[in-house]
A protein has these predicted regions:
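DNA-dependent DNA polymerase catalytic subunits
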Residues: 2-212
């Protein structure tokens, strides 16, 4: 209104509102950013809140414990030191390795179980990794006669998958499951916790650090 009067405008047609006031921000790409927000739409915070858009920590495909770890890491990135970050990464890695398979596996939806199934080789060439894990799960659950305890993975199922260290007893680097990890397959000791942590925590964090 003041500006309209100053320039002697015929009619006031400029309307603005304040969205966020932040003292720090990191952009990795268009619509992918983190802001250290002190004021959001007129609401003032006693402590800054992180606003994240398009970042791994807010994606459902990231294991839940890592989403929290990443948010805490981003907070340190905004307000802490390099030594704080190194200490936090070491602490998070140690904590991650104590978690059960169900918590550190990647959540996904699977839609092509039938498409990639092979009667001779379990799965066909070019099968996506989470789908390959699903077909391997189905195969070994049937082989071990565990279908009374575990439902087979079907198209449209929400699943989790995790990487396995090789060599192992199924000669594969992946296994999927629906809700409970099938410990009867004796694969839990082969879970690659280092690779899981690298892909679900270190790589998303590195993408932010590289942008600084």
């Amino acid at each position: 209104e003041t500006l309209a009067n100053y320039v002697n405008a015929y009619d006031q047609k400029m309307f603005m509102k304040r969205e966020n006031i932040a003292d720090r921000g990191i952009w990795t790409a268009k619509k992918r950013y983190i802001l250290n927000v002190w004021d959001s739409e007129g609401v003032r915070y006693e402590k800054p809140n992180l606003k994240m858009m398009g970042i791994e920590a807010v994606k459902s495909s990231t294991p839940a414990p890592c989403r929290k770890m990443l948010k805490d890491a981003f907070q340190i990135l905004m307000t802490g030191t390099e030594d704080d970050m190194i200490s936090f990464i070491d602490k998070s890695r140690a904590e991650f390795k104590t978690l059960p398979p169900e918590q550190i596996s990647f959540p996904r939806s699977v839609s092509d179980v039938v498409k990639y199934k092979s009667p001779s080789d379990i799965y066909t060439k070019g099968t996506p990794i989470h789908c390959r894990g699903a077909l391997l799960f189905n195969h070994y659950i049937k082989e071990k006669k565990l279908t009374n305890k575990y439902s087979l993975i079907k198209n449209g199922e929400k699943i989790k998958f995790c990487y396995l260290k090789k060599p192992n007893i199924i000669h594969e680097n992946i296994i999927s499951f629906i809700q409970d990890f099938p410990r009867e397959l004796n694969l839990d000791k082969y879970i690659d916790y280092d690779l899981q942590f690298e892909k679900s925590f270190v790589e998303p964090l590195k993408a932010i650090l590289d942008a600084i």
